[in-house]
Amino acid sequence: MAKAETVSKARERIRAWRRDPVQFARDCFGVEPDAWQVDAMRSLGGDPNPARRLVMKACTGPGKSATLARMGWHRLACFAGKGEHPKGAALSITADNLKDNLWAELAKWQARSPFLTEAFQWTKERIYAKEHPETWFLSARSFAKDADSESIGRALSGLHSQYPFILLDETGDMPTAVGRAAAQIFTGSPADAAIIQAGNPTSTSGLLYESCMTAAHQWTVITITADPNDPKRTPRVSKEHAQEMIDTYGRDNPWVMATILGLFPPGGFNSLFGADEVDAAMKRFYRDDQLGNAAVILGGDVARQGDDSSAVCKRRGRQAYPIRTLRIPDTTLVAQQFVQEKARHDADAF
């Protein structure tokens, strides 16, 4: 009877943890989550949700990988049913980055929990339940730098479960195709599924930007900031240092926006022009007499591998023209198209 009561109490506690990830973190890891961590974790609790999407857009140094690791343990420990076990995949911008950051954090936080240490086995490529090693796991995944969407899809395959989840770290520069591949976990009518990602807002062309801006209506977006004026700022970044950087460079400085405020710079972290500036240039129109004898210049971008298209663009003086895309896998044929474009426009240079 004593053993049955113990099992019953354990099940009750896990059910409570499933609904309250914040309490799970307190009980298992002995930590008091920061204000932004509470907001993020609460989005992963409550009633069952077959399509959870959480994105954490972070300044530098707030502990986002540690938070992502705790969320991973919450999914592993608390989401299971009779004959149904959680299956997860973890992915970062590179295999080495995953190994050195998120995967190391998973090991660190497991070591702080006697419950997780007893129930799960951590290895370099896989974390699994000791009693169900084949069906209850979180595996480390990776993809080649030049991988196309099909290859990325294979990197995130094999998560057939009622409780699938995917952890994505450093998504600032991660290809948007990763997001589309990850969303496959929602297609099997799961009981509760989650994609959880975190990254720094250094690029306006990666998965993080797409999730926070273009597809923000699909995601719970948490902005993690070191802004001294924000009551929910991370306490893990010195307020004095943050204020000094703001005073020195200004709030609209791209570096300050990305690394201190947790915001996307208008032109990206390392971009000469922002997307808004390019769009504005494309919408301008000049008459021929305003362009005078301006040279006709063509520019080309060859998509040698991956899921992108090649492109060719015409410019005459200050006038930019619509970009023509070419979905041609053979680079020799792309070169022939470029030659034909130069002749068609009587271009002065390519």
Residue ranges and their predicted role:
Residues 1-300, 312-322, 333, 340, ...:
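Phosphate/NTP-binding elements of NTP-utilizing enzymes
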Residues 325-327:
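Short, solvent-exposed loop/turn segments at secondary-structure boundaries
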Residues 329-331:
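Short coil/turn segments at the loop-to-beta-strand junctions that recur within blades
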